[in-house]
């Protein structure tokens, strides 16, 4: 499938990803979903894709959420999890489809609604084109698009550079409670490391 000149491609995005910011609702930061390092890196890149395709183009309304399919190649999977870990990255993407986040909200009638949502609806692999298609769940988008209050800004390039899921989570909490986000390289310099 040929790509348009301005179309988001994972590889092109990764060349410029350092210090790119995405907003997550604090609900996502505080959720009890347990992701490993590679799964979380995939979520950061999904967030970047959503930002480029829906926030930057001002398509953040439900009518535009029909085309929620992100395409990956083996090269893209290698960037997420390491060139020698493509099968592990493939497994991580499949696992994200099984992980649910508990949600609660009040509907327009004032009724409290409880449910469970996930990041990925479906995951496909085309054996001919060797392209992985990941369909993002539209239910997660309100927590990533047009978030105006109770959100955390994350530098995804920074977050992807960490080597453990615990460090990633700590960075998310640091961003949440710092009032602004901070890059670890500047923080390390200030602390004398």
Residue ranges of model-derived segments:
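Charged, alpha-helix-forming regions
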Residues: 1-193
